[in-house]
């Protein structure tokens, strides 16, 4: 079947990406960025002036190898988790914890995956970038769990595309434009791969497809799109972009049951400088059959499904959806969905790297000529940052890359193994490497480990690697730049399951 977003074996992705690269014949983890000479040993990794010596190598679980490297001054600690689904029954997946409305520690999310301690994930790391500008609890640093790009789980789109990251001129290193979609780490049918996904969502009248409107987001605050990095929509001249966040006073945002809480009310941010979320707007609730069961608008004459009330504070119906509108988005919902006329919600997800497209009309009829291909429920996608390796080549080459931080990376090698790599600096240290690694150094490290495709994931205080202990708990084995493990939006993990193939 052509469409990987539907059910194509992800192993084919890895084989396609190889391009018969020389690394196919390499032993995983044996590649070196520099020759082992002088005071270096055969197992060392040399990154320019940095030499990483192997400090420990263990097999904590069947099919999973953990290798720890440290530099000469023990300023860096590098954890390399090599996960081979051919060697043991291992499954790859991700978790959003209690819901898209909040953040939790990686340990909390891993331990909540099942009540059976022996079936909890073997290991997990922090997942995608998220909007840390919406703080729900300042004391415990709990944020709204708005992932910064395309996220999918259980066959549903949980977060819209971030609009792409900046593309850089290889000579000047300057940003020259935006890529059409954001990078994602995909885990599907026991294989990892990395691609770019764009999304397009539309709500329309089922009996008149000419009456339609763009749905701007999924499971986030109307008026604020974190990590959007997109060009201002010419149709919305009142959109402003600041610090990679788009502020739009006219939106429609979809909420799925995975939001996990009541829909957000107007002015949730309580920020005088931010007014794009102030509109009390309109909210419409739809049941699992796609029938509008309630419409809320302040000042409206109550009757039928209409109530005189602002948006927010409502549970998403089981199996259903909620649509919140502000500005002209509120006007569209009031004029159409609140009248009782049937509407359709159409979602398109496009893989801009491999050319696949899925289209799913959640309720109502599909647009004329649309090909309905549901999202594969076996797939988990989390939004990530810069692509570091593609087809066994370092593609992140930005002159003047000096920003250091704790790092988390995910990737795949030529054999379809999933790799998680963390780089910790030295908290409070004064050595040059104490602040962590640059993206360029991380890319060279992943190249030395013989990865084929790899990406930079959320890092800094978010960097976390957790391993299941003998009691079934999931404590972190990494340090943190924060005072305690950070609350993050999702985690990706390796767990019990799958089908080992090796004899």
Predicted regions and their residues:
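Conserved, well-ordered active-site substructure
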Residues: 69, 134-178, 347, 374, ...
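Zymogen propeptides
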Residues: 34-333
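Active-site-proximal beta-strand/loop segments in catalytic clefts of secreted hydrolases
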Residues: 81-84, 124-129, 413, 422-425, ...
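General beta-strand structural signal in soluble alpha/beta enzymes
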Residues: 123-127, 186-187, 194-196, 344-347, ...
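Short, Lys/Arg- and Gly-enriched loop/turn segments at beta-strand edges
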Residues: 135, 348-366
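Secretory targeting and sorting signals
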Residues: 1-35
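Loop/turn positions that initiate beta-strands
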Residues: 337-345
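A short "linker-to-beta-strand initiation" element
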Residues: 193-231, 358-387, 391-393, 397
């Amino acid at each position: 079947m052509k469409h990987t977003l539907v059910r194509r074996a992800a192993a084919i992705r890895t084989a396609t990406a190889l391009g018969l690269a020389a690394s196919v014949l390499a032993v995983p983890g044996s590649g070196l960025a520099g020759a082992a000479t002088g005071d270096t040993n055969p197992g060392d990794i040399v990154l320019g002036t940095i030499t990483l010596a192997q400090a420990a190598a263990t097999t904590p679980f069947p099919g999973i190898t953990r290798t720890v490297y440290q530099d000469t001054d023990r300023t860096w600690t590098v954890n390399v988790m090599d996960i081979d689904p051919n060697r043991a029954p291992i499954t790859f997946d991700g978790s959003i914890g209690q819901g898209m409305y909040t953040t939790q520690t990686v340990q909390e999310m891993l331990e909540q995956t099942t009540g059976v301690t022996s079936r909890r994930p073997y290991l997990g790391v922090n997942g995608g970038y998220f909007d840390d500008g919406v703080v729900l609890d300042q004391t415990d640093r709990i944020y709204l769990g708005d992932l910064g790009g395309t996220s999918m789980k259980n066959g549903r789109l949980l977060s819209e595309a971030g609009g792409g990251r900046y593309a850089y001129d290889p000579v000047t290193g300057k940003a020259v434009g935006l890529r059409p979609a954001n990078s994602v780490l995909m885990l599907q049918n026991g294989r990892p791969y990395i691609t770019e996904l764009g999304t397009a969502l539309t709500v329309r009248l089922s009996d008149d497809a000419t009456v339609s409107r763009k749905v701007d987001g999924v499971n986030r605050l109307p008026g604020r799109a974190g990590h959007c990095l997109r060009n201002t929509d010419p149709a919305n001249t009142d959109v402003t972009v600041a610090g990679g966040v788009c502020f739009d006073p006219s939106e429609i945002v979809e909420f799925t049951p995975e939001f996990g809480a009541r829909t957000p009310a107007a002015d949730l941010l309580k920020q005088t400088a931010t007014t794009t979320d102030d509109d009390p707007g309109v909210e419409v609730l739809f049941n699992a059959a796609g029938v509008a069961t309630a419409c809320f608008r302040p000042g409206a004459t109550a009757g039928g499904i209409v109530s005189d009330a602002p948006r927010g504070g409502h549970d998403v119906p089981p199996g259903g959806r909620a649509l919140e509108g502000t500005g002209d988005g509120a006007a569209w919902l009031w004029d159409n969905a609140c009248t009782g006329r049937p509407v359709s919600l159409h979602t398109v997800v496009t893989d801009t790297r491999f050319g696949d497209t899925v289209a799913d009309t959640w309720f109502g009829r599909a647009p004329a000529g649309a090909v309905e291909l549901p999202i594969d429920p076996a797939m988990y996608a989390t939004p990530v940052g810069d692509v570091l390796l593609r087809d066994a080549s370092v593609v992140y080459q930005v002159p003047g890359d000096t920003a250091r931080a704790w790092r988390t990376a995910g990737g795949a090698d030529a054999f379809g193994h999933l790799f998680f790599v963390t780089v910790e600096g030295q908290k409070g240290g004064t050595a040059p490497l104490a602040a962590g690694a640059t993206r360029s150094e991380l890319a060279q490290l992943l190249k030395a480990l013989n990865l084929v495709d790899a990406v930079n994931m959320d890092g800094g205080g978010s960097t976390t690697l957790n391993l299941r202990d003998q009691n079934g708990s999931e404590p972190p084995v990494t340090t943190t730049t924060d005072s305690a493990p950070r609350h993050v939006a999702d985690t990706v993990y390796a767990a019990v399951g799958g089908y080992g193939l090796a004899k």
